[in-house]
């Protein structure tokens, strides 16, 4: 019985840990040499995802398809979902220092990490999540 209890505790801890990406609320202020490059919304995730992780992907996709549809059609924004646990994505994960659930906006040399905002709002305040994500993307598009 104790073994089962410890196994369940370990599994729960592992699941929660896999939902925590490298969280830095920062923007790299390097000069953007590719001002014409699109903003890429990267949502990185692991194999095991919690309800909040699933909500982040769902709400990011909704934002991309609804709130940013004109920008997507114009080619100024794109959205990619990346499984951080797959070997083929290792180089991209290392490039951005990602090992779990992480939401990044990238344009040229500039990176904005929205992971904290995503975990705070995707499930409980999806309207606020979509508004903040769309605003951040539009700021990057404008430069």
Language-model segments: which ranges?
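Extracytoplasmic/secreted envelope proteins and their assembly/folding machinery
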Residues: 57, 61, 65, 90, ...
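Bacterial signal peptide processing site
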Residues: 20-22
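Thiol-based oxidoreductase modules, predominantly thioredoxin-like and allied folds used
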Residues: 72-88
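C-terminal motif of bacterial Sec signal peptides marking the signal peptidase cleavage site
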Residues: 15-18
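Local sequence-structure signature of Cys/Sec-based thiol-disulfide redox active-site neighborhoods
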Residues: 34-66
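Non-catalytic, surface beta->alpha helical segment in thiol-disulfide oxidoreductase systems
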Residues: 105-143
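Bacterial N-terminal signal peptides that target proteins for export
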Residues: 1-8
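Structural micro-motif
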Residues: 93-107
């Amino acid at each position: 019985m104790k073994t089962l209890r410890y196994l369940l505790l370990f599994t729960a801890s592992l699941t929660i840990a896999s939902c925590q990406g490298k969280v830095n609320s920062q923007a790299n202020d390097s000069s953007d040499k590719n001002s014409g490059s699109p903003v890429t919304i990267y949502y990185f995730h692991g194999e095991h995802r919690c309800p909040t992780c699933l909500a982040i992907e769902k709400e990011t996709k909704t934002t991309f398809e609804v709130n940013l549809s004109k920008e997507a059609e114009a080619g100024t924004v794109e959205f990619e979902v990346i499984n951080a646990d797959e070997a083929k994505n290792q180089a991209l994960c290392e490039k951005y220092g990602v090992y779990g659930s992480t939401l990044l906006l990238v344009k040229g040399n500039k990176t904005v990490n929205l992971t904290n905002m995503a975990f705070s709002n995707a499930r409980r305040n999806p309207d606020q999540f979509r508004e903040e994500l769309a605003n951040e993307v539009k700021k990057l598009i404008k430069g």
